[in-house]
Amino acid sequence: MAVRFSFYYAAIFLAVGIHLPFWPAWLKYRGLDAAEISLILSVSVWIRAFANPLIAHFADRSGAHKKVIMISAGGGVITYALFGIADGFWALFVVNLLASAMFMALIPLGENLASRASVEHKFDYGRVRLWGSITFILAAYIGGWVVERSGDEAILWMIIAAMVAAFVAGFSLPRRPARDRPSVRFPAFVLLRQKSFLVFIAAVSLLQSSHAVLYVFGTIHWREAGLPDD
């Protein structure tokens, strides 16, 4: 079981390791300016904030975590493939909304399955999760090497290949039974009434916002400073 989740984490963070540093560069390659790139990537975060809880709520109620992961990964392959034919800001904007909702749901859904499975099957969650971090580092390095030699066009194809790997890895994940129905219809709303949770959300928001400029313009800035992708 630990090997299955290690493979899943490796596949997911293969995609993240390419997407995080190089996706803004691909959008610039497609002719978008700094304001358009910022808008597309910032709206992606808001989409995740609303889509992920809804997707997770459905998975918990139905017990279809694996099925939802497979649909999200398959949807990720399709939506990222659509980037290849999308032309212009608004087409890229709409496709990016769909891709963000699909792609980023894979991480919390996988975390949920892995944390529960680590207790039931008695494996070390940290060692399993480690493979995601290792793959992220390797993906960023190897991705830079490929982009330096093949150009920005290769970025999209590497992400699509990584999403295919995530789809394949999803087949090996265990199925989970549906949870008992809670006493309230949307348990997440209960958290929003807790002061400590709101403070936590505020702290995480500030942490994420401090990374935003680096995530969006880091690679572009380093290129303009004369640093190679590899």
Where are these predicted regions, by residue range?
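Juxtamembrane intracellular "pre-TM" segments in multi-pass secondary transporters
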Residues: 170-208
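Cytoplasmic helix-loop-helix junction between adjacent transmembrane helices
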Residues: 95-131
